[in-house]
């Protein structure tokens, strides 16, 4: 077991490769990434056996920026017989089970990469899931409760109709979503599709059990670059009063809520009203990532907000390096002022050439 598979948005394979190589080296694990442009996944092969399992346990998945899923995989199963794909797949799982106890497994995902070519296999994968699940259950696997906080999900990752990897991810260190993609429904009354970015960010960064405590009707938010109101919509939906900062017009439906004040100002110059305690800052402005980082840092250092979610638009080249530089600069700014904070970043499904960052100041 010396291989990891990591899913990603097509076109971001090199960023995933750089990130997993860095994260592995921090743990003293070395290997190389197999990258195929626009494939939607990366294979990281460790030089030593069993180290992939260690990485799947010890690299905090929620600290990976560009990966949608992380799992330990077998060697590629090739030339599967269309008349019986199940037998060699079960045999490959049996080989993996020599090192990992699949009695604690609870779910099976038969998946493809998130590309147009791979999606042509989606109907097959859906139909194949039922007989494969039955075969794996006969082995005594997939019987654990889905709500448990330990154990594994089993994965069968098809790259071609008769070629797949089999593997597993750890329940306490993976994405629980099929293909690593949350399925969100666009609200009919939302002003723009960008609303899904902030909804996914909230679901990603804030535990469900804490959401009502951290986003509620007793709080005030600021949305920089708010027009037409996709991000403001998510805050208003959760009860916040929002200062929507943008020279452009806001959706009439948001004005009708009575929960926003439209401030026709430059987002870089706006300051929160005096004697108003702002809890949340959100920002989705099209600007250089270094400039947005400085703006967010200013708000946090001045005590103008306690928690923030914002987007960093990525350059055409050296995207991973730019992200790390921006995050490190922000961390240094806050640490120099002795602020305690938690920072996370993710290339969300609803992001494109951008990442979403969450920072929360702690007491």
Swiss-Prot record:
The active site is at residue 313. It holds the Pfam family RlmM_FDX. It comes from the Bacteria. It is an enzyme of class 2 (transferase). It is found in: Cytoplasm. Keywords: Cytoplasm, Methyltransferase, rRNA processing, S-adenosyl-L-methionine, Transferase. GO terms for cellular component: cytoplasm. Its EC number is 2.1.1.186. S-adenosyl-L-methionine binds at residues 194, 227-230, 246, 266, 284. One of its GO terms (molecular function) is S-adenosylmethionine-dependent methyltransferase activity. InterPro entries: RlmM_FDX (IPR040739), RlmM_THUMP-like (IPR048646), RNA_MeTrfase_FtsJ_dom (IPR002877), rRNA_MeTrfase_M (IPR011224), SAM-dependent_MTases_sf (IPR029063). One of its GO terms (biological process) is methylation. Its main location: cytoplasm. It catalyses: cytidine(2498) in 23S rRNA + S-adenosyl-L-methionine = 2'-O-methylcytidine(2498) in 23S rRNA + S-adenosyl-L-homocysteine + H(+). PANTHER family: RIBOSOMAL RNA LARGE SUBUNIT METHYLTRANSFERASE M (PTHR37524), RIBOSOMAL RNA METHYLTRANSFERASE FTSJ DOMAIN-CONTAINING PROTEIN (PTHR37524:SF2). Catalyzes the 2'-O-methylation at nucleotide C2498 in 23S rRNA. Monomer. Belongs to the class I-like SAM-binding methyltransferase superfamily. RNA methyltransferase RlmE family. RlmM subfamily. This is Ribosomal RNA large subunit methyltransferase M. It comes from Haemophilus influenzae (strain 86-028NP).
């Amino acid at each position: 077991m010396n291989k990891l598979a990591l899913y990603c948005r097509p076109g971001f394979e090199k960023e995933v490769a750089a990130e997993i190589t860095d994260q592995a080296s921090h743990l003293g694990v070395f290997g190389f990434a197999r990258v195929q442009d626009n494939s939607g996944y990366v294979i990281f092969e460790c030089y030593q056996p069993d180290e992939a399992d260690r990485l799947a346990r010890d690299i905090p998945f929620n600290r990976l920026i560009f990966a949608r899923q992380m799992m330990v995989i077998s060697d590629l199963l090739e030339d599967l017989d269309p008349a019986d794909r199940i037998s060699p797949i079960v045999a490959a799982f049996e080989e993996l089970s020599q090192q990992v106890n699949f009695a604690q497994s609870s779910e099976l995902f038969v998946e493809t990469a998130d590309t147009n070519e791979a999606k042509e296999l989606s109907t097959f994968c859906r139909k194949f899931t039922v007989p494969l699940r039955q075969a794996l259950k006969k082995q005594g696997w997939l019987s654990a409760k889905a709500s448990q906080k330990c154990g594994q999900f089993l994965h069968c990752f098809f790259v071609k109709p008769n070629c797949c990897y089999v593997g597993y991810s750890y329940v306490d260190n993976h994405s629980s979503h099929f293909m690593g993609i949350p399925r969100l429904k666009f609200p009919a009354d939302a002003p723009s599709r960008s609303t899904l970015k902030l909804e996914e960010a909230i679901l990603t960064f804030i535990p469900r059990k804490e959401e009502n405590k951290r986003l509620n009707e007793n709080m005030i938010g600021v949305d920089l670059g708010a027009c037409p109101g996709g991000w403001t919509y998510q805050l208003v939906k959760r009860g916040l009063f929002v200062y929507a900062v943008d020279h452009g017009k806001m959706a009439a439906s948001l004005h009708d809520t009575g929960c926003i004040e439209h401030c026709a100002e430059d987002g870089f110059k706006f300051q929160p009203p005096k004697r108003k305690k702002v809890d949340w800052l959100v920002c989705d402005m099209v600007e250089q990532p270094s400039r947005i980082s400085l703006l967010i840092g200013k708000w946090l250092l001045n005590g103008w907000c306690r928690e923030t979610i914002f987007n960093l638009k990525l350059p055409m080249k050296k995207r991973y390096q730019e992200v790390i530089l921006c995050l490190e600069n922000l961390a240094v700014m806050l640490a120099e002022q002795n602020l305690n904070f938690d920072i996370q970043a993710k290339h969300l499904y609803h992001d494109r050439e951008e990442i979403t960052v969450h920072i929360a100041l702690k007491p």
